């Protein structure tokens, strides 16, 4: 009973390819279980889909969301690694983006979140994207409105995405559109 029931329900949902904790576990059990809540008056986003994951990352580009986590609660720690700071080479342009340690930026990054150890090639444009760990993006490449999964390589001259559709790119390149 209690948390054991929650874990069982969570495992059942995963086998059914359902990952929405709020709808699949909390709301589904509201009439049969005692559920206690805490009124949260700050930022919250239910990450139950790829779109939700993308939106949550993009929300961190808003000063009020970023400030809530990093100014109001400055003791948020992530995994400690001994990485150099991000490097912005001559000709690079970055606006309204979060660039993590170990990244090398040679191109343009706009409205994007770039996780650690990513490489952005010369004359490449990254726009409205989430670039995960250890991604290599070659020269003269455009990545727009995409999530690029960890350890992916985007070859020079490739163009992924457009402003109307969210795409997920993996190690073997294009995975699916949403």
Pin down the residues of each PLM region.
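Short, small-residue-biased leader/transition segments that mark boundaries at the very start
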Residues: 2-7
């Amino acid at each position: 009973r209690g948390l054991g029931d929650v874990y069982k329900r969570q495992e059942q949902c995963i086998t059914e390819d359902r990952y929405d904790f709020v709808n699949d576990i909390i709301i589904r059990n509201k009439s049969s279980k005692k559920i206690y809540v805490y009124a949260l008056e700050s930022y919250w986003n239910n990450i139950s889909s790829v779109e939700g994951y993308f939106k949550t990352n993009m929300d961190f580009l808003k000063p009020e969301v970023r400030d809530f986590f990093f100014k109001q609660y400055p003791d948020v720690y992530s995994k400690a690694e001994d990485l150099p700071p991000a490097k912005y080479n001559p000709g690079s342009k970055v606006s309204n983006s979060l660039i993590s340690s170990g990244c090398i930026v040679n191109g343009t990054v706009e409205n994007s979140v770039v996780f650690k150890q990513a490489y952005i090639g010369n004359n490449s444009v990254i726009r409205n994207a989430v670039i995960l760990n250890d991604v290599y993006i070659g020269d003269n490449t455009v990545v727009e409105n995409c999530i690029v999964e960890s350890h992916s390589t985007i070859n020079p001259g490739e163009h992924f995405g457009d402003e109307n559709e969210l795409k997920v790119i993996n190690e073997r390149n294009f995975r699916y559109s949403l």
